[in-house]
Structures are given as structure tokens and as C-alpha cells.
Amino acid sequence: VTPRAAIQQIARMVRDDIRSGELSPGAHSVGEMLAAQPEALLLIVDLTGAEGRKKRPDAAMHHAYSFMLGQALDRLRQRSESGNGHATRAMENVRAAIAQQMRSGKLAATAAMALVSAFSRAGIEVGEDIRSAMDHAMIQTGADHQNLPPPDAAEMLKDLVKACEGDPFLIQSQFAELTAAMPVGLQLSLLEGLVLADDSSLREAAIGWLLAEPAIATPLASMIEETARQGLVSAASVTNLMLIRNWVSEDRRAAIDAIIRAARVVGSVPEKRRAIQVRELLISERDGAGAQSIFASIKQGRKNGLVSILIKQGHGVRDAWVAPSLSRPEIEDMLDHIASEMSVHETTAEDTAFILSSALADGSPNSPPPFGLVQAITLLGLSDVAAKSVSVEDLVALMLSDADAAATDAKAVEKAVRASGRWLATNPQLDSWFENGDDVAAAIKGRRKIEDRIAAIIDKVLEPNRAYWASVIAWSAFAQRGDGHDSDWIEMALVAREMISERPLTEIPLVRSIAMQTVEAART
């Protein structure tokens, strides 16, 4: 079977899974397989174009290719964020292939939209090359934003509201996927339809783009401010805007404040929150890539739901979603599955707000959090979650402030450091604690002996990144302390503090363990 035929076969399997409404284990694992073979992603682009050129293209195959690409891009993004240059280049090559095939006429706009939506789902910027190619394709077909048929747009929005059952956050997510590759002018034209819509759920969804790039957010803010003066900004939107204003730069905050003032003049005030019961609140330990998750089982009225938030060290809040209208057994099954995949611990609303505030400060000012975080925070019953930077020193000091002196004295520190060499044997979560950036290959190049490689990793990779690993360890301790096993999390907090001290890394057994796992990962 040729690689091309193999990709087609996988796509048919995914298509059938999508039609059945349930993804098979094979579909779930396709992303990892494709990410390991970047050339296969270019085949997906080519096959999507070929499907679109058929007399009767199969839209379900487009969805399948989009799913496969999205799964692979998500894996590549994670690796790229960890400094893996191969992953970064693979994503750039996919962008270039899509743009090139669009310009050559091999990839129709509808097929391209299916592929580009994968970038949006994976949390990756589409890029100007694709937007320019999309603009070119639309001009060639006479479908630029000046010629967009309003009835079609109105019908699309009506169908979107129905499919999303009026959920503004789901509407925003789905609409963002549809418009990600569109030129800014066309996006703003379509967003104006949301801002001026009769349906309040569309207007509430529109404020999500105040977290988009400035070219979108700035003119959109002016549109929404004008409608606020007309009483078209709801109380729910005012409540959401008061959260969002804390997550953006000062210039954006001024524009959002202007919307809030205009809405209040005509009587729109923050709505009273509905009673929400948080049945279970869990937090994972931080993995080697810096990822940490929060999960919550909630009840709102008669409905049960699951809230999930993903934090990424150095990148802030990467994702937030809510699965509403689930049964309690379904939620329990999902949480059981999560617990089988990672170490999770009970936590409190106060600690959740604390780590989210830290994550918001940790992200790039140019990359605000996803709009779904507003919904997640609201359903968790949190309020006024604003960016607040927390250093490792301050975090450790806070955690240890109530600990017994005997548990944190010099003797306890040495005991914790010695014990750190055994952590990997007792905590499966730590299997992910290794480096996989380009600096690893450079460090071990020309070194054949394992001990030489380990020494090089410690000296040339882990030493420059000791602050990163101190943060990973400290936030893992923060997660563990909710279980009440003081000795475990206190040991971890003490080792985190040693990581940012002047103590040689060669004296910390955990560091050697991380280096050994890094060497092993580099061999695979």
C-alpha cells in the first residue's frame, strides 16, 4: 500500500466514525502517527484538493481530512512550543502547501476552508500567506466580501444558532473555524452580521472576537460600542466583558470599558449569576511540556456538565471548553478515563482562581486566552480572575507558610532532594518529564556513551532551563497538596526551591532522571 493509499484508507475510517457519531481508538491515535511523518500532512493537503476537484466531492471526506490534520497539528504545536524546530517547520510546510495549491487552483475554497479550520481547532495562527491566497481565490470566483450574498450569510447564521442550540460560546468557536482563513475585511463584514443580529446569542458570541488580533478586535469594538448605545448589548455580555477586560492590554481595555459604559447608560447591567453546584474540582500535575489541566463536574439547574481548562507554561491558558447536558454516569466515566491518563488531585475554587490568575500573566500579551475561558470561569463560580504573576519563590513560600518547621528545615531539604531520584518510579505522570527541543540534539551530538550524553544534557540543556523545571515541579506540588499527603507535596516544593538556588544540578537526583529520560527520548 502506497503512503497516499494508506492516508485515504485512514480518512475513510475517520469518515465512517464521524458518520456513526463515535470515534474509534484508531481515529484518536491518528494525530500522533501523522505528526511523526510530516510528509503525510502534505499528502492530506493534496488529497483534500483532489477530492474537491471531483464532479461529486464527498464533504464527509473533507471533514475527515480536516480532523486528521487538526489532530496532527495539535501534536506539532505542542512540540513546537517546547522548542522542536522540526515541528515548527512541518507546520510552516503545511501552510505553504495549502497557500500554493489554492493559488494554483488545485485546492478549491471550500476544500481549503475544511483544512484551515484544523488550524483554528489546534490553536495555531493561519498566517497571512493562506489569507492572501484565500483572498485571491475569492476574487477569482467573484466571492469577495463586497459581493457576498447577504441571504446566504443570514441563512448560515440561522443554521449555526440552531446547530449550537443558542450557545454563544459554541457559536463563537464554530464561527471562528469557518472564518479563520478569510481576509480581515471579509471577517469583519461577517462579524458585523453577528453584532447587528436580531438573535441575542449571535450578539453575545461576537464579543469573543475582542480577544482576536488587533486588526479584528479594534474595529469590532467600535461596532459593538455603537450597538451598546442602542441597547443591543445584553446583561450577559456586560458580565462577560467585565471578565475579558482584565485579560487584555490597556489600549484594548479602554475600548472594552467604553462598551460597558455605553451599555450601562441604556440600562444593561451585569446579570445575577445563576446558582451552580460544583460537585468535583480536580487539577492535574504539570507535565514535561508544561501542560496542566483543570476539570470540574458541575450542575446547573437540572443539567450536568464537565468543564475543562488547559494551561501551558509560558503560553498561558491554551484551551477551555464545556461539555453541557451530560448524564452523571457519562461525567464519571470521563473523569475516570482522565484519571487513568494523568495524575489528578482534588482542589478548591480559591486555588483554581490562583493558578488561572498566574496562567493569564504567564501568557503572551499578544495572545489573549480563548473566549471559552469566560464560560468556564462563570460555571466554576469564580469572579474577578485577573492576570497576576507568581514567581516560583513566592509560590513555594506560600505553600510552605503553614508547614511545620521540622518538615522544611535543612535536614528535610536534604531528605527531599535524595528522595527525588525515586519520584519517577512511583509517579507515572513524571514519565513526560524530559526535554525534546533542538538543543537536545546539539548537546548530545558526537557523544556515544550514555554517561557523556547525560552530563551534556544536564550542562547544556537543563542548566539553562532550570527555572522552567523549577516551575513545573512547584506547580505539580501545588496540585498534589489538595490530597492532604503533606510529605509528598512538601518534598516536591522543597526540591523546586533547590532548583532555583545556586545548588549544582548534579547534586539533585531528579535532574539526572530527567536527563536520562531525555537521552532515551532522543533515541526514539
Where do the language-model regions lie?
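Non-catalytic terminal/accessory regions
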Residues: 1-205, 214-229, 234-524
